[in-house]
Curated annotation (Swiss-Prot):
Record flagged with keyword rRNA processing: no
Enzyme class of the recorded protein, top EC level: oxidoreductase
Assembly mode: Homotetramer.
Cofactor: Mn(2+)
Annotated cofactor note: Binds 1 Mn(2+) ion per subunit.
Species in which this protein is naturally found: Aspergillus fumigatus (strain ATCC MYA-4609 / CBS 101355 / FGSC A1100 / Af293)
Keywords: Allergen, Antioxidant, Manganese, Metal-binding, Mitochondrion, Oxidoreductase, Transit peptide
Cross-referenced SUPFAM superfamilies: Fe,Mn superoxide dismutase (SOD), C-terminal domain, Fe,Mn superoxide dismutase (SOD), N-terminal domain
Entry protein name: Superoxide dismutase [Mn], mitochondrial
Reactions catalysed according to its record: 2 superoxide + 2 H(+) = H2O2 + O2
Protein family: Belongs to the iron/manganese superoxide dismutase family.
InterPro entries: Fe/Mn_Superoxide_Dismutase, Mn/Fe_SOD, Mn/Fe_SOD_BS, Mn/Fe_SOD_C, Mn/Fe_SOD_N, Mn/Fe_SOD_N_sf, SOD_C_sf
Length: 210
């Protein structure tokens, strides 16, 4: 069997994002949901390897969706955990990202207008997906975009993302997505977002390198 991906540890305790994201949600989201994507990605890559060795082209084609879905889930969640931080560790403090803050204000007129635009995008997602702040390069043009299901961001560099799958909020907020979207601003890791914006890396996810 080839080398496998593993579940990355959280950079903070499971209860550290309360009251905005409960300990129960964080434990289930990380230990169960993210682990499932990691397991699915490893299984799909092993199936791809065997299909290639057998020159089984139909199997090679059929396994691509599983690689995309589970690989995207692993990428998105690995980014998500790091773009959150407890309030006591600086979560929610936009002043920790002076370069990014200035770019946001230039693009949207004010930080509050940006938050309103981002939340409108989040609440407009139909079904399951993600909302993202992205840049087209190092300290580049900012934009708000969405991805469906577990599709990762492509063609741009993710600055930060918000998981809008029900498993990210339902046990705490039920169907009140607006309160989840409002609360998560209190735990955004702006220092991490600043680093991603300055780097503008469109594909360099170190956790995806075996």
């Amino acid at each position: 069997m080839s080398q496998q991906y593993t579940l990355p540890p959280l950079p903070y305790p499971y209860d550290a994002l309360q009251p905005y994201i409960s300990q129960q949600i964080m434990e289930l989201h990380h230990k169960k949901h993210h682990q499932t994507y990691v397991n699915g990605l490893n299984a799909a890559l092993e199936a791809q390897k065997k299909a290639a060795e057998a020159n089984d082209v139909p199997k090679l084609v059929s396994v691509q969706q599983a690689i995309k879905f589970n690989g995207g889930g692993h990428i998105n969640h690995s980014l998500f955990w790091k773009n959150l931080a407890p309030e006591k560790s600086g979560g929610g403090k936009i002043d920790q990202a002076p370069v990014l803050k200035a770019a946001i204000e230039q693009r949207w007129g004010s930080f509050d207008k940006f938050k309103d635009a981002f939340n409108t995008t989040l609440l407009g997602i139909q079904g399951s997906g993600w909302g993202w702040l992205v840049t087209d390069g190092p300290k580049g043009k900012l934009d708000i975009t969405t991805t469906h299901d577990q599709d990762p961001v492509t063609g741009a560099a993710p600055v930060f993302g918000v998981d809008m799958w029900e498993h990210a909020y339902y046990l705490q907020y039920l169907n009140d997505k607006a309160s989840y979207a409002k609360g998560i601003w209190n735990v955004i890791n702006w220092a991490e977002a600043e680093n991603r914006y300055i780097a503008g890396d469109k594909g360099g996810h170190p956790f995806m390198k075996l």
